[in-house]
Amino acid sequence: MIKLIRGFRDILPGQVELWQDIESKARVLLENFGFREIRLPIMESTELFARGIGADTDIVEKEMYTFPDSKGRGQTLRPEATASVVRSYIEHGYAGSDPVQKFYTIGPMFRHERPQKGRYRQFYQINAEMFGVASPLADVQIMYMLHLFFTGLDVPDVVTHVNSLGCPECRPKFREALISFVSDKMDRLCSDCQRRADANPLRVIDCKVPGCKEAVQGAPSIQDHLCPDCKEHFEAVIKGLDGLNVPYEIDPRLVRGLDYYTRTTFEVQTTLLGAQNAVAGGGRYDGLVKILGGKETPAIGFAVGFDRLAALLGAEEKDFTVPPALFIAALGDEARKIAFGWLCDFNARGVRAEMDYEGKSLKSQMKQANRFNAGRVLILGENELQNGMAVLRNMDTKEQEEVALDGLTDRVAALINQG
């Protein structure tokens, strides 16, 4: 038997309904805030992610699924969506013609990392990206949307952790202070952090290796190195969150795992998923459009971890299954032929209906209707054909009535729609 590849999974009926509910609520919220859906390919040029995410990040160095094409050019299954959205934004001329845009996308991402609770090699994200707005009000709105989203889903114990990573003007001073801090702790750092310490010391702060996390305790805070403009921007963000009553914590150690972030960065965290405690995250990436070949354009966005969110909500064992309103029990070939026509008619009208296709006994078919938890059963056999009347049984009240075969689907559909 061929089995699933490690780190991948099937999302089965009973689970899918929860995912559909989350997705539906996300679409409504995003579109209420003016975001429009964009659908993107799952494979892009490897260069897009190397330039966009950062060549020194764990994602690019270790986690990407990359394949050569027939000419030896690298192609990569997307490990995140933002770089792809930016590529599309530039390629289709938005940056030049109408730079203020809001997009969202929902779909699978791929990273070759160690599978664990809430983490898979194919995982799903809800992504929202806003281009062309430099105001801190955009940052506030993005985090407020996430607050509304998780509140609307009744997700417990969530709080937004927020930080500022500064800009190209103030980050070099912080970088120097950080390099100086880690220089005498190199022997306590993992091999990756030792290699990255000079070129990209922020990655040392972001490292999840316990020894590295311990070594950087007491490291300089970016908050102490912000330039006046970045400090003013961050203060405006905090004031905006206060004004909208969004729960937050200022977290000077929050740097995220992507190099494109500038100024505001944030994570929505919960205590209910163990070590994998972030269910959403994002931030500002004002330089990314230019890095990828477009004009300098302010931008901000977020990604929601669909798998972790579904695991969190699924723990409450909500039942999203919608049972059929009608089960048709047919006895005999002629009755089954007529019943199949009714079934198709009901389904076309939007009535959720099922039937037995195999010619089982009435007793077996009634058991099947119970397993489906059908609201009503329509019975058609030889006697009903002779009398010109089918039997309609209410499975809750056990009451039953006869319904004329002529015009039956009209009358039964009307009864079901009445409740």
Swiss-Prot record:
The keyword Ligase applies. GO terms for cellular component: cytoplasm. It is found in: Cytoplasm. Its EC number is 6.1.1.21. Keywords: Aminoacyl-tRNA synthetase, ATP-binding, Cytoplasm, Ligase, Nucleotide-binding, Protein biosynthesis. One of its GO terms (biological process) is histidyl-tRNA aminoacylation. It is an enzyme of class 6 (ligase). The keyword Transferase does not apply. It comes from the Bacteria. PROSITE patterns: AA_TRNA_LIGASE_II (PS50862). It catalyses: tRNA(His) + L-histidine + ATP = L-histidyl-tRNA(His) + AMP + diphosphate + H(+). GO terms for molecular function: ATP binding; histidine-tRNA ligase activity. Homodimer. Belongs to the class-II aminoacyl-tRNA synthetase family. This is Histidine--tRNA ligase. It comes from Desulfatibacillum aliphaticivorans. The gene is hisS.
